[in-house]
Amino acid sequence: MKRIPSIRERNIVLIGFMGVGKTSVGEQLAKRLFRDFIDVDQEIEKTWKMKISDIFRLKGEEAFRKIEREMTIDYCTNTSLKVISLGGGAYMQDAIRTACLDHCIVIYLDLSWSLWKERLNVLIDNRPVLQDKKVEEMEQLFTKRQPTYQKNSFQVETDGREVAEIVSYLEEVIKLGWEIYGS
């Protein structure tokens, strides 16, 4: 039987809608906690030697979600001491969500719709799920995903906060959790 990692060893998984800052926060948080950082989307691109948008276009969303599911579950169940950033839609898959909640500390980076919408021009070209969508459709997707993101270990509001401030807050909360819950 596989040993369950202690609270200090558990991977930390960052979830939230695309473009909320999971990668930026994750990279800095990993450095602060002396852990490796894994961006699942970047790992998929490395493994498949193509952009996510090309995988969507050539293989379809269903094939991409299967790749994403297998890779994410492997990271959650077979590694420790990592900070892992998930793509915005990954956590919508039941199997991924279950693996994350059972084996990791799941942190939801929450950003309001109004502030997310301000980032839209920067995001749209690299997000296949947003291609050819109207703003109203994007808002529907944003709203639809919120209840699933609420299933987490804890949540941090990111509105009006710089990445460094979010990282410092998370480091403090995580270390406090380690003290309270021990090994």
Curated annotation (Swiss-Prot):
ATP binds at residues 19-24, 127, 161. Keywords: Amino-acid biosynthesis, Aromatic amino acid biosynthesis, ATP-binding, Cytoplasm, Kinase, Magnesium, Metal-binding, Nucleotide-binding, Transferase. Its cofactor is Mg(2+). It comes from the Bacteria. Its EC number is 2.7.1.71. GO terms for molecular function: ATP binding; magnesium ion binding; shikimate kinase activity. Its main location: cytoplasm. It catalyses: shikimate + ATP = 3-phosphoshikimate + ADP + H(+). GO terms for biological process: amino acid biosynthetic process; aromatic amino acid family biosynthetic process; chorismate biosynthetic process. Binds 1 Mg(2+) ion per subunit. Belongs to the shikimate kinase family. Catalyzes the specific phosphorylation of the 3-hydroxyl group of shikimic acid using ATP as a cosubstrate. Monomer. This is Shikimate kinase.
